[in-house]
Amino acid sequence: MTIAVFPGSFDPLTNGHVDLITRASRMFDQLIVTVGKNTSKQGLFTTSERVAFIEAAIAALPNVTVQVEQGLTVDFMKSVQATVLVRGIRNSTDFEYEQGIANLNRHLAPQVDTACLMADPQYQYVSSSLLKEVARFGGDLKQLVPSMVAKAMVARLEGDH
């Protein structure tokens, strides 16, 4: 049985994330989506809120679970016997960044392989900072994030401009 892990901060969860999770769920026996905190970014949603958004979005995917992760992803992977780390790639900048992380992870945990999935072209330009800016100024988020996330973003950022 192949267990894969798809880590991220998911702040906010995007339709691009949901697309990658759905595609990865078809490739592996079990997929664990891990929610972590990106210490270099100001958070919009709490960890609990992000977990709830993901769980709602993936409810129809029986082989996908969501867990909170603190620490090194490869250490978490060892603890659940996962052997594949799934990453989404939007552009060449993402690729170069992920290549460096994959090499480091391979050094720390030789049993871990990284599988990079190319983002669907309709989501290649989407980033969390861009989405927050769109929400702050009342832009339409319907095609970019799940509806529950769009509503929560508008409520959270209302009057923040």
Curated annotation (Swiss-Prot):
GO molecular function per UniProt: ATP binding; pantetheine-phosphate adenylyltransferase activity
UniProt KW Membrane keyword: no
Reaction catalyzed: (R)-4'-phosphopantetheine + ATP + H(+) = 3'-dephospho-CoA + diphosphate
Highest taxon in the source lineage: Bacteria
Gene3D superfamilies: HUPs
PANTHER family the UniProt entry points to: PHOSPHOPANTETHEINE ADENYLYLTRANSFERASE
Matching NCBIfam families: coaD_prev_kdtB, cyt_tran_rel
Name of this chain's protein: Phosphopantetheine adenylyltransferase
